[in-house]
């Protein structure tokens, strides 16, 4: 969150990156980074910009009719008002002309999650005389971070999700030889009930899939279309949940209901080794205090899978 106490670290990062400033923009919640950094109360329905310079105080450009959300803006920081597109563009040019600024923009839409500012707004900022670059590293350092409470909540959710996922596979295995084996949908329902009884919430899912269904990363069983889970099946359980207002934990568990075949073992070892390669790269870089990017970690895992002959089937990304 942008506050006076967080400003020095942010401005130090701007200086290290060779940037003149970070320009936040939002309209009707289009840009979650701007929304999260500012945490304005109430609803905003007009365009606004917030310019965080490498030195000096931040400046907000706000609409004249929408001042309520800005009542908590520090009095030592500037706040300008506009009431027409001409006054907006004039104020913007006064702030960023000749400057190299970061925005929530990803060249070529390389990282869609970061590409939040509309192309027309980028054009407006460039027409104001600024050079626009991506704010990706700033977003990672100052927005996409957890508080201590969020981390603790995530870890609690992660432990619960892990327990429920493994129990689900054991339950399916114990029922596979009975007169009433579970269906994918029945096991999905059981997991949802465990979430609810444990004080967890989810948006949809989980994915419970056997055989060919497990090859569909977004498969979800329904009451009308659901396979029966039998002995000898490979079962996938992909589940995610969080505490109320907490941080999601997302895990995938797979198990063989019975002795796995040689082919099953071969594929499992490839996936395990790919996971270990990714974790090894992370540990190596972090222990050496060297930067590491998600794409590098993905490459480390993907290289193992490809060399084992399964690259064309690795259709999902790594990272969650």
Language model region names:
Residues 1-319:
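Active-site neighborhoods and metal-handling regions in enzymes and metal-associated proteins
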């Amino acid at each position: 969150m942008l506050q006076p106490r967080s400003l020095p670290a942010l401005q130090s990062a701007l200086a290290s990156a060779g940037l003149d400033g970070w320009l936040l923009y939002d309209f009707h919640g289009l840009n979650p980074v701007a929304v999260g950094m500012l945490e304005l109360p109430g609803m905003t329905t007009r365009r606004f910009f917030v310019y965080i310079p490498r030195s000096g105080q931040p400046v907000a450009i706000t609409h004249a009719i929408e001042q309520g959300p800005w009542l908590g803006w520090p009095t030592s920081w500037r706040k300008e008002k506009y009431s027409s597109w001409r006054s907006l563009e004039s104020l913007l040019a006064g702030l960023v002309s000749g400057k190299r600024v970061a925005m929530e923009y990803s060249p070529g839409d390389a990282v869609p999650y970061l590409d939040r500012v509309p192309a027309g707004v980028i054009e407006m900022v460039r027409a104001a005389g600024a050079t626009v670059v991506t704010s990706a590293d700033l977003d990672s350092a100052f927005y996409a971070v957890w508080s201590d409470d969020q981390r603790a909540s995530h870890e609690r959710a992660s432990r619960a999700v892990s327990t429920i996922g493994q129990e689900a596979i054991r339950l399916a295995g114990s029922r596979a030889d009975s007169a009433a084996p579970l269906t994918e949908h029945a096991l999905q329902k059981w997991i949802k009930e465990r979430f609810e009884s444990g004080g967890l919430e989810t948006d949809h899912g989980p994915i419970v899939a056997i055989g060919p269904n497990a090859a569909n990363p977004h498969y979800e069983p329904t009451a009308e279309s659901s396979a029966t889970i039998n002995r000898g099946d490979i079962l996938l359980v992909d589940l995610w949940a969080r505490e109320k207002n907490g941080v999601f934990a997302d895990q995938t568990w797979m198990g063989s209901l019975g002795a796995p075949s040689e082919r099953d073992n071969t594929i499992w070892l490839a996936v395990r080794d790919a996971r270990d390669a990714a974790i090894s790269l992370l540990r190596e870089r972090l222990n050496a205090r060297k930067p590491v990017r998600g794409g590098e970690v993905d490459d480390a895992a993907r290289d193992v899978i490809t060399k084992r002959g399964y690259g064309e089937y690795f259709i999902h990304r790594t990272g969650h």
